[in-house]
Design a protein with these regions (language model features):
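Short, solvent-exposed beta-strand-terminating loops
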Residues: 51-74, 121-137, 188-200, 277-289
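Generic low-polarity alpha-helical segments
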Residues: 3-8, 49-51, 175, 181, ...
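The feature marks either
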Residues: 14, 123, 140
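N-terminal, post-signal peptide beta-strand-biased segments of exported outer-membrane/organellar beta-barrel
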Residues: 19-125, 129
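Bacterial Sec-dependent N-terminal signal peptides
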Residues: 1-23, 455, 460
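Outer-membrane beta-barrel porins/channels
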Residues: 22-27, 34, 135-460
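Proline-rich low-complexity regions
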Residues: 14, 39, 336-338
Length: 460
């Protein structure tokens, strides 16, 4: 179990300054990867091929209730006071979240004037660790606070690494409605999740020693599968690829989406993503500890005739009352379901009045709109509301400026740039731009980058 926690720590810690949404990318028509956020989007081009391993790279993560500046700011306050403020200022609904995606390959082609088919594969890492408020306070305060109860229910985490093979179809029903769906086959490389943790720790006055410590109704379970090794030296880089393509821990899911056009200038879109399940049945190691335990510590007796291993006796007594069970039973894990919705109004001088050739269904130079996003997490639903402004500059550059209110802040400014030089599409997207000069002040940020080759042809 310790090895699992070490692995998750090294995966999560480098990214805890990033945020969890893709609102700059959503409904960005020029970019093929928008099809992964809404399979029913009005994608306007005829063919695309993603540059292998570079078509879509995104890193998103965040920490609610905490940023590095809160602790390390040079403001004259004691760092001990600042750490104390953080420890007692956060609660069990605060979380550390990271999501990373790497587009391994992606292809899209227009089957007819009304149908577009796309398929590909990407790798995804998603993890959420909730702040175990009582446990952190226990370690900070020590065990001498009499009769103060500390709950272990706040110890919750979920993490997974998986490969996703997908294929989707976008169908234009009529001039006003476009719908789409995407089938996903999951291959889990690693999964770890806690389940129904409960129990209470408190300290009372002892009879033999000063204090007596009590662990009551303790029941903790962590389920793991996939790339978990008893010895880290057993891991080989080839294991990552082998697991991804072996489908030893398979799953299935789907996305649905639509775009409804009320007029030439007014659009409404929506999508639901990752309605899916993974069956974890290979390399399953689940650990459960259950029981009650009371101790007044170790009472030392000095006798020249008896040599006693007090520590061994203590550990044996502990494990006899709190036995660790290792299970290999398969279990199911569910993908975090996501919902997107948007309203967009286009205006300004149309493309064709300046003699530019436009391949898009929306010929106007400017767009404004509103987006909503939510994702289902183990304890709380997370939300994001975004205002955006889009602007085209000629036929080669498109920009998108966003302002978001989310679970992390009320001042998230994002910017997206998408260029097209001949068939080459390059895009760069980022948010939390207000904190570029001092990223330590940000609770969240995200970065996305990709290169695609886009081609068009006319259908009769």
């Amino acid at each position: 179990m310790i090895k699992i926690m070490k692995l998750l720590f090294f995966l999560v810690f480098p990214f805890i300054c990033f945020s969890q949404n893709m609102q700059v990318l959503y409904d960005f028509d020029e970019i093929p990867q928008t099809l992964l956020l809404n399979p029913g989007t009005n994608y306007s081009h005829d063919y695309f091929i993603g540059f292998p391993l570079l078509a879509g790279i995104s890193i998103d993560g965040g920490a609610t209730g905490l940023n590095m500046y809160d602790i390390f700011a040079d403001d004259g306050r004691s760092i001990n006071d600042k750490i104390s403020d953080v420890i007692y200022g956060m609660d069990t609904k605060d979380s550390f979240i990271v999501n990373e995606k790497l587009d391994i390959f992606s292809v899209g082609l227009r089957l007819s004037e009304n149908d577009f088919f796309s398929f590909g594969m990407y790798e995804e890492f998603d993890a959420v660790l909730y702040y175990p408020s009582d446990i952190v306070q226990l370690f900070y305060e020590g065990t001498t606070n009499l009769n103060k109860e500390y709950s272990v229910e706040g110890a919750n985490l979920s993490a997974e690494i998986l490969g996703v093979f997908h294929a989707g179809v976008t169908h234009k029903v009529n001039e006003n409605l476009t719908i789409g769906g995407r089938l996903k086959l999951y291959s889990s490389l690693l999964n770890a999740q806690t389940k129904n943790n409960r129990g209470t720790f408190y300290t009372s006055t002892g009879t033999i020693n000063f204090y007596q410590h009590h662990l009551v109704n303790f029941d903790a379970t962590i389920q793991t599968s996939g790339l978990i090794y008893k010895d880290e030296d057993d891991f080989e880089p080839s294991d990552f690829t082998r697991k991804m393509f072996s489908f030893q821990n398979p799953g299935i899911g789907f996305d649905l989406g639509f775009t409804h056009q009320f007029s030439e200038q007014l659009y409404v879109t929506g999508s639901i993503l990752d309605i899916g399940i993974v069956k974890n049945s290979e390399d399953v190691y689940s650990y459960n500890i259950r029981g009650d335990y009371d101790t007044e510590g170790v009472e030392l007796e000095f006798s020249p005739d008896v040599r006693q291993d007090y520590w061994r006796d203590f550990v044996e007594d502990l494990w006899s009352k709190l036995p660790l069970d290792t299970l290999h039973t398969s279990y199911n894990s569910f993908r975090p379901i996501k919902l997107n919705a948007s309203v967009k109004y286009s205006f300004g001088k149309p493309y064709y009045e300046d003699c530019f050739e436009s391949s898009t269904d929306d010929p106007y130079l400017n767009s404004i709109g509103f987006q909503l996003y939510t994702i289902k997490r183990p304890l709380v639903q997370m939300f994001d509301a975004t205002l955006f402004y889009e602007r085209r500059f000629g036929s080669m550059l498109r920009t998108k400026l966003t302002y978001s209110i989310d679970s992390y802040s009320y001042s998230n400014i994002g910017l997206g740039l998408s260029t097209k030089f001949g068939p080459v599409n390059l895009y760069v997207l980022a948010d939390n731009l207000l904190y570029l000069q001092n990223i330590a002040k940000a609770n969240n940020a995200s970065f996305q980058f990709g290169i695609n080759f886009i081609f068009d042809k006319k259908f009769p």
